[in-house]
C-alpha cells in the first residue's frame, strides 16, 4: 500500500529528494521526529543567524539605528508576503501573529454594520476576536468534509450580503484545503471584501488569489521565528480602515498602515521571518506545495489501517496535514504525550476549542514538512500503534 502511494505521489522523485535534502541541510539536526509544522516549523540556520545578527547589531549601535539598517530586509519580507498573497501592491504590516493581525483588522473595520460570514469550523480564538469587536457571525454552508459549498454560499451571500467574508483556507483541526480561488472570484463578483486567514495556508497551499486581506503567521509553514505575523491589505481597503488607536494631532502624519504597525516590536524576529520568506521563494513555492501534498498522501495511506483511529481527510487532499479522529476510546491527549516522552515524536493534540462550533471531540494531528520522509511516516505509524496500546488503560 505504501509503495503504491509513493508511486502515485512521486515522493521519491529526484526533484522531491533534492528539495527535501536542501531543506534538511539548511537546518539544525532534528532531535527526534518532528511532525508538527502546522504548529511550529523548524527554523533554518539562515533565519536563526539573521535574527541573532540583528540582535547583536542592536547591542552595537542601538535598537533604532539597527532597525533603520534592517529596512531593506523588512521591505523584502513585505514584498514576499504581497507576492504570495497575489496582491503585489498590498500594504503589509508586521504583527505578533495571526490573531493579532485579525484583531488589528476587525478593530479598525469601517462603519457601524458588523456582520461577517465564515465557516462553521472557524478557529475558536478567531471567533472570540470577532465577538470582541461586535461582529455578528453567519455560518457559510459547507459540504460533509467541511469544504465550503460554493453554490449554496453564492445564493446566501447574494441574498443577504455580510460586511465581509472571512475564510480560513486550512483549518487548525482538519487538513482540508478550501477552494480559495473560487471563493475569491465569487466575492469579487458580489463586491464583498474577502479576508483570508492564511495561518495554515501561507507556504502550504496556494494563497495568491488577490484577496482584499490576507493575514498569516511566521512560525508555521514558512518556518520563521515565533511571535511574528503579517497583515496584507489591498490599498483601497487600507485607506478605509480606522485605526483603533489613531495618531494624535500633535504627531507627524502617519499612513493607516503605519498607525496599525505603530508600537514596540521584536525587529530581530521580523528580520528572521523575512529571511525565511526569501528561502521559501528560493526553494520554489509550487515545488514546496507539491512536496507537502505528496507527504499528506503517503501519511494518510500509511495510517489508514491503524487500529483505534480514523483518518479524517481524503487520501488525495492537497495538504500535508493528516487528522486522526479516535475510535474505540483512543485518547489523543495521552497518545500525544506518550509519543513525545517515549519516542520523541512531536505531534499536536487538538481540543474542541480549536473549532467549538464544529469539532465534536479532540483529535490528533500530524503535519510533516518537506524534509520528512516516507520512512518517518512509517516510524510514526508503528509508534502510534504502540502509543495507542500503551495508553489504552489510562481511560
From Swiss-Prot:
Q: Which Gene3D superfamilies match?
A: Aspartate Aminotransferase, domain 1, Type I PLP-dependent aspartate aminotransferase-like (Major domain)
Q: What induces it?
A: Not part of the egtA-egtB-egtC-egtD operon.
Q: What is its EC number?
A: 4.4.-.-
Entry-annotated residues carrying N6-(pyridoxal phosphate)lysine: 220
Co-factor requirement: pyridoxal 5'-phosphate
Look up keyword Lyase and say if it applies. Answer: yes
Tell me one GO molecular function of this protein. Answer: hercynylcysteine sulfoxide lyase activity (ergothioneine-forming)
Enzyme class of the recorded protein, top EC level? lyase
Functional pathway:
Amino-acid biosynthesis; ergothioneine biosynthesis
UniProt KW keywords: Lyase, Pyridoxal phosphate
Q: Where is this region: Disordered?
A: 1-21
Tagged with keyword Transmembrane: no
- Please give the InterPro entries that the UniProt record associates with this protein: Aminotrans_V_dom, EgtE, PyrdxlP-dep_Trfase, PyrdxlP-dep_Trfase_major, PyrdxlP-dep_Trfase_small
Segments passing through the bilayer: none
Q: From the UniProt annotation, give the residues forming the signal peptide.
A: none
Q: Which domain of life is it from?
A: Bacteria
Instruction: Enumerate the Pfam families for this protein.
Output: Aminotran_5
* Catalysed reaction, written as an equation: S-(hercyn-2-yl)-L-cysteine S-oxide + AH2 + H(+) = ergothioneine + pyruvate + A + NH4(+)
UniProt lists the family membership as follows: Belongs to the class-V pyridoxal-phosphate-dependent aminotransferase family. EgtE subfamily.
What's this chain's function? Probably catalyzes the conversion of hercynylcysteine sulfoxide to ergothioneine. ERG is one of the major redox buffers which protects bacteria against redox stressors and antibiotics; loss of ERG or mycothiol (MSH, the other major redox buffer in this bacteria) leads to respiratory alterations and bioenergetic deficiencies that negatively impact virulence.
Q: Which protein, by its recorded name, is this?
A: Probable hercynylcysteine sulfoxide lyase
Identify the coding gene: egtE
Amino acid at each position: 500500500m505504501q509503495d503504491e502511494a509513493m508511486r502515485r505521489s512521486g515522493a521519491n522523485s529526484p526533484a522531491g529528494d533534492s528539495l527535501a535534502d536542501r531543506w534538511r541541510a539548511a537546518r539544525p539536526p532534528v532531535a527526534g521526529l518532528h511532525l508538527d509544522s502546522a504548529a511550529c516549523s523548524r527554523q533554518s540556520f539562515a533565519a536563526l543567524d539573521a535574527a541573532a545578527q540583528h540582535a547583536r547589531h542592536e547591542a552595537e549601535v542601538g535598537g533604532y539605528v539597527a532597525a533603520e539598517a534592517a529596512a531593506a530586509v523588512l521591505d523584502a519580507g513585505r514584498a514576499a508576503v504581497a507576492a504570495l498573497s497575489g496582491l503585489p501592491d498590498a500594504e503589509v504590516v508586521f504583527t505578533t501573529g495571526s490573531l493579532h493581525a485579525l484583531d488589528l483588522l476587525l478593530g479598525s473595520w469601517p462603519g457601524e454594520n458588523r456582520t461577517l460570514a465564515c465557516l462553521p469550523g472557524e478557529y475558536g480564538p478567531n471567533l472570540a476576536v470577532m465577538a470582541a469587536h461586535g461582529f455578528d457571525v453567519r455560518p457559510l454552508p459547507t459540504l460533509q468534509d467541511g469544504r465550503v459549498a460554493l453554490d449554496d454560499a453564492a445564493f446566501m451571500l447574494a441574498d443577504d450580503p455580510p460586511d465581509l467574508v472571512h475564510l480560513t483556507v486550512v483549518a487548525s483541526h482538519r487538513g482540508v484545503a478550501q477552494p480559495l480561488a473560487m471563493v475569491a472570484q465569487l466575492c469579487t463578483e458580489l463586491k464583498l471584501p474577502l479576508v483570508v486567514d492564511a495561518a495554515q495556508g501561507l507556504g502550504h497551499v496556494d494563497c495568491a488569489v488577490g484577496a482584499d486581506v490576507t493575514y498569516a503567521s511566521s512560525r508555521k509553514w514558512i518556518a520563521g521565528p515565533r511571535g511574528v505575523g503579517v497583515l496584507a491589505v489591498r490599498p483601497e481597503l487600507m485607506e478605509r480602515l480606522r485605526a483603533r488607536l489613531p495618531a494624535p494631532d500633535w504627531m507627524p502624519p502617519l499612513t493607516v498602515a503605519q498607525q496599525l504597525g505603530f508600537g514596540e516590536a521584536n525587529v530581530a524576529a521580523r528580520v528572521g521571518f523575512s529571511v525565511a520568506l526569501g528561502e521559501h521563494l528560493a526553494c520554489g513555492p509550487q515545488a514546496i506545495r507539491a512536496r507537502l501534498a505528496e507527504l499528506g498522501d503517503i501519511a494518510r495511506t500509511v495510517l489508514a489501517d491503524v487500529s483505534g483511529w480514523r483518518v479524517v481527510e481524503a487520501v488525495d487532499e492537497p495538504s500535508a496535514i493528516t487528522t486522526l479522529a479516535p475510535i474505540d476510546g483512543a485518547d489523543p491527549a495521552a497518545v500525544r504525550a506518550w509519543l513525545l516522552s517515549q519516542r520523541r515524536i512531536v505531534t499536536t493534540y487538538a481540543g474542541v476549542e480549536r473549532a467549538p462550533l464544529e469539532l465534536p471531540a479532540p483529535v490528533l494531528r500530524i503535519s510533516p514538512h518537506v524534509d520528512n520522509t516516507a520512512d518517518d511516516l512509517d516510524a510514526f505509524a508503528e509508534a502510534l500503534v504502540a502509543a495507542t496500546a500503551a495508553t489504552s488503560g489510562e481511560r
